[in-house]
Amino acid sequence: FAPEPEMLAENARRDCAMVAPHYGLSFPKGANRPNAELVGRVEPLLTLLRSDSRFIEVGLEAGRALWAGDVEALDKLSERVPSADAATVREALEAGSRTRAKRRHYSGAMFSYAGEWFWGVDRLHHLERRLIELGASSAGKKKAIRFDRPPLDAGENQNDARLRLEMFPSLRSPYTAMIFDRTVGLAESVNIPLELSPVMPMVMRGVPAPGAKGIYIMTDTLREAKHIGAPFGNMHDPIGRPVLRGFS
């Protein structure tokens, strides 16, 4: 459901390498997409551990080896961890896809808890806060958020004509609606020229948008807007002529 899937994957890897250090994590810079052979080695290792306490430990180790293309590390891991056969792996993947569809979501690589979805480390603070409020934290409600959102702080230094901020707003994107004023304010606070490069909504470019994706985007935007104190509520879908008139 992406107009440029290869470009999206490349940007995702670059973003991971840039964002990870701010959360105390790591991701290899310049990582390539893992080839099918390496993925085919990792899946059997994890399949039999889905309900095993070792899943997290083995998953992290396998993930690091996968993204680093470290065949030797996978060889050593395979000596310690039993592998599932191809049929068992296929059944596990199909079962996972059915469960995801039943819970009305459109993508893998997600966390799900009690009807709420979390798509990456930058959303985990929502899950942490929810668990703390429920009393599910061993440290009680005073527990610090492990993956809290870093503050949006432009600093005190003013732009010396070397920097510019380019924004690609989509008039149908709730994320654009939520973040536009903050983006303008950020640019103004340090005297950075803001250049707007509008983009046509994906569905108006022929990219399919399943209902589950739309539901997630709207609920995620509402969750994010509440967190930053941005106004977000009832709306009309501007697809079609309203978007064209807005751009004009």
Where are these regions (language model features)?
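Short, surface-exposed alpha-helical recognition segments that flank or form part
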Residues: E4-M7, A84, T88, L171, ...
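Short His-Asn-centered micro-motif
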Residues: A114, P169, M235-H236
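Structural alpha/beta surface segment adjacent to cysteine/selenocysteine redox centers
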Residues: F1-L66, I179-S248
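C-terminal cap of thioredoxin/glutaredoxin-like
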Residues: E61-E156, R164, I179-L186
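Local sequence-structure signature of Cys/Sec-based thiol-disulfide redox active-site neighborhoods
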Residues: F1, N159-R182, V199-M200
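A short, structure-level motif marking secondary-structure boundaries and short turns
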Residues: A2, V81-P82, M167-P169, R205-V207
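Short, solvent-exposed loop/turn segments at secondary-structure junctions
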Residues: N35, E116-F118, L124-H125, R172, ...
